[in-house]
Amino acid sequence: MAATASPGAGRMDGKPRTSPKSVKFLFGGLAGMGATVFVQPLDLVKNRMQLSGEGAKTREYKTSFHALTSILKTEGLKGIYTGLSAGLLRQATYTTTRLGIYTVLFERLTGADGTPPGFLLKALIGMTAGATGAFVGTPAEVALIRMTADGRLPADQRRGYKNVFNALVRIAREEGVPTLWRGCIPTMARAVVVNAAQLASYSQSKQFLLDSGYFSDNILCHFCASMISGLVTTAASMPVDIVKTRIQNMRMIDGKPEYKNGLDVLLKVVRYEGFFSLWKGFTPYYARLGPHTVLTFIFLEQMNKAYKRLFLSG
């Protein structure tokens, strides 16, 4: 039986029993990209909602559903997939880097006897990997925010990026290379908050459900705990996310940026748009979180199975 094989065994019958790390990282990035194809419209709506009513202007969209129907009406079906190339590049850079860093740190901190890191150490590894991946993925994030925001502007104010690579080249040429990392601090902070909130809230939610006496440790309990965790994670990370979105989309006015820093964004949003505007786009953000995670793991499992069938069997 495979379970009785020694932990250090790397080969069986002359063939590797598992796929190489490089293949795992590649599949992680591809799985995230595959999931993005399905949830990109939700990302677009979330970004539009976060920019709606900026600077005490009248809100363009009353609700997320209103935003979606308005985009479909004015920009067509193709419009809800604006920025897809940037979304795909974000996954290729962020997910691959995060997975790579997590795997390396996890293996480094695993005991000589094979004992895995404890809960707190795993949480720290996850937050470190998330923050590093967010830094690497920030240029794609900047391009994504700008591309998804373009359709809400008058024609003469649009940036008109053709695709993510055109966006990156133009941003670097017109505004300088450092602009590609504009908003990297809130982007990294969001990654840390998301990782921390997911870990803490999932464990607590699962324990609460089990203690209630109405649930057993099965897939229904896991699903409900995941939904609660997603709710907590969305609520915790959205104020940081709107800071990121506003900073990455801002323009220079008379040689000065619209916002001085993240705190300035928070204060202006609360002052001119109301406290609860920090959670604009809550519905599409929450609706995106679950499906993206589920689809990512489905694609990842299928690619791993295909690789084993083609290269590791026999």
From Swiss-Prot:
InterPro entries: Mito_Metabolite_Transporter (IPR050391), Mitochondrial_sb/sol_carrier (IPR018108), Mt_carrier_dom_sf (IPR023395). The modification N-acetylalanine is found at residue 2. GO terms for molecular function: oxoglutarate:malate antiporter activity. The modification Phosphoserine is found at residue 6. Pfam families: Mito_carr. The modification Phosphotyrosine is found at residue 102. Solcar repeats lie at residues 23-108, 117-208, 217-306. It is a multi-pass membrane protein. The modification N6-succinyllysine is found at residue 57. GO terms for cellular component: mitochondrial inner membrane; mitochondrion. Keywords: Acetylation, Antiport, Lipid transport, Membrane, Mitochondrion, Mitochondrion inner membrane, Phosphoprotein, Repeat, Transmembrane, Transmembrane helix, Transport. It catalyses: (S)-malate(in) + 2-oxoglutarate(out) = (S)-malate(out) + 2-oxoglutarate(in); malonate(in) + 2-oxoglutarate(out) = malonate(out) + 2-oxoglutarate(in); succinate(in) + 2-oxoglutarate(out) = succinate(out) + 2-oxoglutarate(in); maleate(in) + 2-oxoglutarate(out) = maleate(out) + 2-oxoglutarate(in). GO terms for biological process: gluconeogenesis; lipid transport; malate-aspartate shuttle. The keyword Transport applies. The modification N6-acetyllysine is found at residues 73, 256. The chain crosses the membrane at residues 24-42, 83-101, 119-140, 183-202, 222-240, 281-300. It is found in: Mitochondrion inner membrane. Catalyzes the transport of 2-oxoglutarate (alpha-oxoglutarate) across the inner mitochondrial membrane in an electroneutral exchange for malate. Can also exchange 2-oxoglutarate for other dicarboxylic acids such as malonate, succinate, maleate and oxaloacetate, although with lower affinity. Contributes to several metabolic processes, including the malate-aspartate shuttle, the oxoglutarate/isocitrate shuttle, in gluconeogenesis from lactate, and in nitrogen metabolism. Maintains mitochondrial fusion and fission events, and the organization and morphology of cristae. Belongs to the mitochondrial carrier (TC 2.A.29) family. Interacts with SMIM26. This is Mitochondrial 2-oxoglutarate/malate carrier protein. It comes from Mus musculus (Mouse). The lineage of its organism: Eukaryota, Metazoa, Chordata, Craniata, Vertebrata.
